[in-house]
Amino acid sequence: NTVSSFQDILMRMSKMQLGTSSEDLNGMITQFESLKLYRDSLGEAVMRMGDLHSLQSRSGKWREQLSQKFEEIRWLIEEVRHRLKITENSFEQITFMQALQLLLEVEQEIRTFSFQLI
């Protein structure tokens, strides 16, 4: 379940943040939260099926936003992979492995939602 996965990853990253003064980690947490909200809103639009007009009226540039989210996901995947390579802490390794898996799942969910809306 990606909802509980998001919560778990964010909680684990917050714990890691306490042990470091890394602004990068802070940025990653913010992007994960933003990604979760975006995925949830796309999911809601799909659940209301036929709500494409509502989605478009809220944001006439939803395709542009979709493209931007995919870029953010790719950036996060690269950032997580980089962190995974440089950390030797097992708690961090597990967290970043879970984050990577979550990002791949969410990318697929967003892709599926967007195809249904198109």
UniProtKB/Swiss-Prot annotation:
The keyword Transport applies. It is found in: Virion; Host nucleus. Keywords: Host nucleus, Host-virus interaction, Transport, Virion. A motif (Nuclear export signal) lies at residues 9-18, 82-91. Its main location: virion. InterPro entries: Flu_NS2 (IPR000968). GO terms for cellular component: host cell nucleus; virion component. Transmembrane segments: none annotated. Average number present in a viral particle is estimated to be 130-200 molecules. Binds M1 protein. May interact with human nucleoporin RAB/HRB and exportin XPO1/CRM1. Mediates the nuclear export of encapsidated genomic RNAs (ribonucleoproteins, RNPs). Acts as an adapter between viral RNPs complexes and the nuclear export machinery of the cell. Possesses no intrinsic RNA-binding activity, but includes a C-terminal M1-binding domain. This domain is believed to allow recognition of RNPs to which the M1 protein is bound. This is Nuclear export protein. The lineage of its organism: Viruses, Riboviria, Orthornavirae, Negarnaviricota, Polyploviricotina.
